[in-house]
């Protein structure tokens, strides 16, 4: 059914038209909810530090998490104390939790675990992102800026900067769920607060900043050792991906000159279990970094030669120039106890 809808969302065919009346009701509810927050009839919370929300208006993944990691590293390079909050999609609990190196992935969620591993920044997860942010600031009161992963529709959290992310799907047929892929009306949502638009695909459908994404030229084992992908170029390998667009990962592996003997396209946030790898015993298996945070934790991952291939994601310089232009005035209003790290 998912694939049927994804196909229907590309155009305004018979199925999309059949669902269009429901989409109109969805649109009314979306606009009503936003109006209630805007008029203060539903409560929202503002924090003393700048909050940057990264999200999308299209259902499914579009590259939000790689952008969050790129933002964190950008701010860290400037010496800023930065934290991250997330709902932690797919996690087993709902309580607020700091994601640490030893936190089980089923408690943190795969994306928060990856963000913490890749950046070392404080990462907090909770069902309500406002609670996660309160706990983050209580634990790290000198934090200068907070990045919220996937929170564009979480209006209970007031934000200073909004970044909307799009892949090559753009807005699809331009209709709201379930007749189309849109969670919110576009470009109406652009006029109502989105500050920056970033395209993560190769063919931007409309105006916005662009980015470059490709796989690294090496893969990483569980012990942290690296292996050049060229060393795998003349042997068949298995590739698996439990992300929103597995085929994109497979295509990038092929672009690196690899021969994929078998591909395993799994649902986004797939919950790997002990025994899942038995059928691949003795094989060389390439996976995404997001899958690796779960697979490396399995006691039987040593049965296979499991390697994670990092994604290199770089927004164009003009994007960061625009972002810094928005953030700098906000940082200047912070107390002196916030801001740059001391060395």
Curated annotation (Swiss-Prot):
The catalytic activity, as recorded, is:
a lipid A disaccharide + ATP = a lipid IVA + ADP + H(+)
Q: Which GO terms describe its molecular function?
A: ATP binding; tetraacyldisaccharide 4'-kinase activity
| GO cellular component terms given for this protein | plasma membrane
Pfam families, A to Z: LpxK
Q: Name one GO biological process term.
A: lipid A biosynthetic process
The keyword Transferase is assigned to this record: yes
User: Which controlled-vocabulary keywords does the entry list?
Assistant: ATP-binding, Kinase, Lipid A biosynthesis, Lipid biosynthesis, Lipid metabolism, Nucleotide-binding, Transferase
Against InterPro entries, the record matches this protein to: LpxK, P-loop_NTPase
> Per the UniProt record, which EC number(s) apply here?
2.7.1.130
Identify the pathway.
Answer: Glycolipid biosynthesis; lipid IV(A) biosynthesis; lipid IV(A) from (3R)-3-hydroxytetradecanoyl-[acyl-carrier-protein] and UDP-N-acetyl-alpha-D-glucosamine: step 6/6
Instruction: Locate the residues binding ATP.
Output: 58-65
On whether Nucleotide-binding is a keyword of this UniProt record, the answer is: yes
Q: Which family does it belong to?
A: Belongs to the LpxK family.
Q: What does this protein do?
A: Transfers the gamma-phosphate of ATP to the 4'-position of a tetraacyldisaccharide 1-phosphate intermediate (termed DS-1-P) to form tetraacyldisaccharide 1,4'-bis-phosphate (lipid IVA).
Protein's name according to its UniProt entry: Tetraacyldisaccharide 4'-kinase
The organism that produces this protein has a lineage beginning with: Bacteria, Pseudomonadati, Pseudomonadota, Betaproteobacteria, Burkholderiales
